[in-house]
Amino acid sequence: MILGLGIDIVEVSRLEKWLNDKKLLERFFNKEELEYVLSKRDGAAPSLAVRFAAKEAFGKALGTGLAGIELKDIAVANDKTGRPFLELFGTALQALKEKGGASIHLSLTHEKTTAAAVVIIEG
């Protein structure tokens, strides 16, 4: 049963500015996410933007927003085939449990100027 659906769209240029601010990046993204994003060179800004959109979409799918959730506790990872998925830790994992969520579906897309994410929480 679907418990929540969230979508978010981000302007890549907004997040491109963050690439020069290490403190800001470390506030919102975990080490593995940053290593992946920064390995993209020319694609770093869209990759960063789509990950931020995924975090925002997760908050919307919860129906409570991201209040009380550390954004570093929501991480976008990729399986062996490259399929993205959300890894939750700490405050984000607790929020999912409180919602009664058992699984999360994630879809990401980006172009040069925009990035979007859709999150579905099932219980």
Curated annotation (Swiss-Prot):
Keywords attached to this entry: Cytoplasm, Fatty acid biosynthesis, Fatty acid metabolism, Lipid biosynthesis, Lipid metabolism, Magnesium, Metal-binding, Transferase
Catalysis: reaction(s): apo-[ACP] + CoA = holo-[ACP] + adenosine 3',5'-bisphosphate + H(+)
Chain sites annotated for binding Mg(2+): D8, E56
EC number, as in UniProt: 2.7.8.7
UniProt xrefs under NCBIfam families: acpS (TIGR00516), pantethn_trn (TIGR00556), PRK00070.3-2 (NF000832)
Cofactor(s) for this UniProt protein: Mg(2+)
UniProt-annotated location(s): Cytoplasm
GO biological process per UniProt: fatty acid biosynthetic process
Function per UniProt: Transfers the 4'-phosphopantetheine moiety from coenzyme A to a Ser of acyl-carrier-protein.
Name of the protein described by the UniProt record: Holo-[acyl-carrier-protein] synthase
